[in-house]
Amino acid sequence: MLLRGKTAVISGGAGRRGIGFATARLFVEHGARVAILDIDSKAVREAAAELGAGHVGIACDVSDAGACRAAADEVISAFGHVDILLNNAG
């Protein structure tokens, strides 16, 4: 995969048995930087920590436009840009 150096944002990615987290792990294995968004603040921090250094977990309710804007600002602050968006929440 051509993911080295790419930045991916994955919503609904904190569930360790779900498609979002599995995709996040695959992206990391192929060199991407990943930001996981999830409504569960504790789970999203733990999921990002499991991915390793250089990845972030952001608590975000994707049904709240303001929360999405704040999450986008946090991702841009951390990585500078976004290459891939996987809307997996819900």
Please name every model-derived segment:
Residues I39-R45, A59-D73:
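The beta1-alpha1 cofactor-binding region of Rossmann-like NAD(H)/NADP(H)-dependent oxidoreductases
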Residues A47-A53:
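Short, conserved SAM-binding/catalytic segment
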Residues A8, G20, S63, A72, ...:
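Ligand-binding pocket scaffold of soluble enzyme catalytic domains
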Residues V9, A35, V56-I58, L85:
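Conserved Rossmann-like nucleotide-binding pocket used by diverse enzymes
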Residues L3-R4, A53-H55, E74-N87:
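A glycine-rich helix->loop->beta "capping" turn
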Residues D38, D61, D83, N87-N88:
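Acidic active-site catalytic centers that drive phospho-/nucleotidyl reactions
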Residues F21, R25, E29, R45, ...:
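Amphipathic, non-transmembrane alpha-helical secondary structure
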